[in-house]
Amino acid sequence: MKDQGLIIGIEYDKSVIQACVYDMRAGIPVACDEVSGLSIADAIRRILGRYNVDEIGSLCVKSGLSDIEELNDISDQINSLGINENQYMITGPIQSFAYYAYSQQKELYKSGVVLMDYDGQIINIYRLSYNTADGVQYIVSAHEQYTIDSQSGMSDKKLVEYVSDYFSRNTASSVYLTGKGFDVKKLPDGLSKVLVNGRKAYIGQNLYVRGACYAAYENIYHDIFDNVTLLVDGCIKVN
């Protein structure tokens, strides 16, 4: 099964944002260059050509789109390359993040894992956790949203206060930050201290695409989610 074609994850919003290929030797997704702005079909062709490979083993496209016509367009682009339905998935942001988070070491999610997606005005927080019912394991999500007045000049202070309040009410083994509202080089004063108080903290703008790549891998090998049901917001299509 190790030689059945490339395992690819793509982040898409009307055009390709970024893409990853799963490195079987390293056991991690590896970023693909020069695919931003392409269609899904063109990005896949470029990736296959770069790796000198003819076949897709598994593909996952993370989409923020919910319109059925746009989702059908994604499927049409994939189908135009001769990729079978059982070879690809289309996932939403939180679904992709779940694949990323639960592909990490257990110590990073055993007490819950939190995603903070901040666009500079609205912060969406999702907490994922295991739950068991009737002998079946589930991953469930809880969502909060908070609007920060960016015109007041107090946005950083309000952000730190809200995050501090959130973690006074919620436990987590780790927290992941993403979105254009977070500066990966410098977080607001006081925020780092709040984030790492009793948990691990990570920041990056590639969480969703890496999660999509892990999802594509999982679609073949079932290492993590074989006996787990994923019940999170934004589940779009899993073949």
PLM features: residue spans?
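Conserved phosphate-binding loops in N-terminal lobes of ATP-dependent enzymes
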Residues: 2-75, 79, 143-160, 165-172
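Active-site neighborhood for divalent-cation/phosphate handling
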Residues: 57-104, 205
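Conserved phosphate-binding/catalytic loops in two-lobed NTP-binding clefts
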Residues: 83-96, 189-213
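A short acidic (Asp/Glu
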Residues: 69-74, 100-102, 123-128, 183-190
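Acidic, glycine/GT-rich loop-and beta-edge segments that sit at the periphery of enzyme/chaperone cores
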Residues: 213-239
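Gly/Thr-rich phosphate-binding beta-strand-loop-beta motif of the actin/hexokinase/Hsp70
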Residues: 1-30, 102-142
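Glycine-rich phosphate-binding loops at beta-strand->alpha-helix junctions
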Residues: 59-70, 163-194, 200, 204-205
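ATP/nucleotide-binding catalytic cores
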Residues: 74-79, 111-115, 193-195
